Amino acid sequence: QLTLLSQWLRSEGHLVVFSEWNSSPIVSTTTSRGKKRQLLTPLTFSLIHSTDFSDRIERDIIPALKAGAIVLADRYVYTAFARDVARGVDRSWVRSLYRFATLPTLAIYFRVPLDVALYRILSGRPKLKWYEAGMDLGLHSDVTESYKLFQGRIQDEYEHIVREYGLAVMDATRPVEIQQRALRQLITPYLRGEAPGPMGP
């Protein structure tokens, strides 16, 4: 959806910068090695992702905003809020860890049922990944059941975040073109300067 949105914004004459979660070169190698060896603890995940986010804020996001660009972030601090808390990390501690975050103008939660999310993943690759299924938490010996339990925790936490921070919610089960139309309608007031300012992190 963000790729389509980015293309549309550029066609409308806007300068657009894209920032992706866990993409900083500072930590990408460390993260990859840790996952392969199954060495990452919940706290380690928090610290690594915070380091990644901090680097992208300073290197990509803030300079782009100062240049007048629209920054589209594929996942933001709310990803850490949901995943880390689902892994058992203290909610207040995680929020404090990201207190440096630039306030987003708009944050959107693409809501999708667990069974649909699972189907989409397995349609693209043969099996679930160890950490994405929450196997490190010992929730269940079966990887699929562990995924459902872990992702269920994440979804519950996202619902808490939606209420706490006022995230916009999109039904991610709808056809792509309908979602894209809704996205454009949602952000148009912001482009015209008719919407409220930044929301809380």
Q: Model-flagged regions — what are they?
A:
Residues 1-11:
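A conserved segment at the C-terminal end of the G1
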Residues 4-6, 122-201:
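NTP-dependent small-molecule kinase module
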Residues 10, 65, 162:
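Conserved ATPase "switch" residues in P-loop NTPase domains
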Residues 14-102:
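ATP-dependent small-molecule kinase phosphotransfer cores
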Residues 19, 110, 170:
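Hydrophobic residues at beta-strand termini and immediately following loops
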Residues 23-26, 77-78, 112-118, 175-176:
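Conserved nucleotide-binding/hydrolysis micro-motifs of P-loop NTPases
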Residues 72, 108, 158:
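Conserved RecA-like P-loop NTPase ATPase core
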Residues 80-153:
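A glycine- and Lys/Arg-enriched "phosphate-lid" helix/loop adjacent to the NTP-binding pocket
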